[in-house]
Amino acid sequence: MSWQAYVDEHLMCEIEGHHLTSAAIVGHDGAVWAQSTAFPQFKTEEMTNIMKDFDEPGFLAPTGLFLGPTKYMVIQGEPGAVIRGKKGSGGITVKKTGQAMVVGIYDEPMTPGQCNMVVERLGDYLLNRA
């Protein structure tokens, strides 16, 4: 299965009538492996900072998580494995795998729990395949 198929079929799938706003699989180096059409343009340093938070949990807490034009307030995740952010009625979940990050961005009516489930399920699957 191609990386794009993982994004299209596993991340952008419908859950209880809702789906993510956008999603991507991004290498640890910040290179995009696959993304949905609406995934925001981002700076390499934004991905570098996300990777740094995986290595040093809490690194993003004082400044927030920036991805493209959006700043997310970092909320409780799983240190070294999952970063979660909130912005208004939406948010972001980033799951680290062996070589990549699975990123999902959502807005209402999708819930944070639904976003977490979609992103973390694919991330866990990829981790178990390695």
Swiss-Prot record:
GO terms for biological process: nuclear migration; regulation of actin cytoskeleton organization. It comes from the Eukaryota. InterPro entries: PFN (IPR048278), PFN_euk (IPR005455), PFN_sf (IPR036140), Profilin_CS (IPR027310). A motif (Involved in PIP2 interaction) lies at residues 81-97. Phosphorylated by MAP kinases. Disulfide bonds join 13-115. Transmembrane segments: none annotated. The modification Phosphothreonine is found at residue 111. It holds the Pfam family Profilin. CDD domains: PROF. One of its GO terms (cellular component) is cell cortex. GO terms for molecular function: actin monomer binding; proline-rich region binding. It is found in: Cytoplasm, Cytoskeleton. Keywords: Actin-binding, Allergen, Cytoplasm, Cytoskeleton, Disulfide bond, Phosphoprotein. Its main location: cytoplasm. The variability of the residues taking part of IgE-binding epitopes might be responsible of the difference in cross-reactivity among olive pollen cultivars, and between distantly related pollen species, leading to a variable range of allergy reactions among atopic patients. Occurs in many kinds of cells as a complex with monomeric actin in a 1:1 ratio. Binds to actin and affects the structure of the cytoskeleton. At high concentrations, profilin prevents the polymerization of actin, whereas it enhances it at low concentrations. Belongs to the profilin family. This is Profilin-12. It comes from Zea mays.
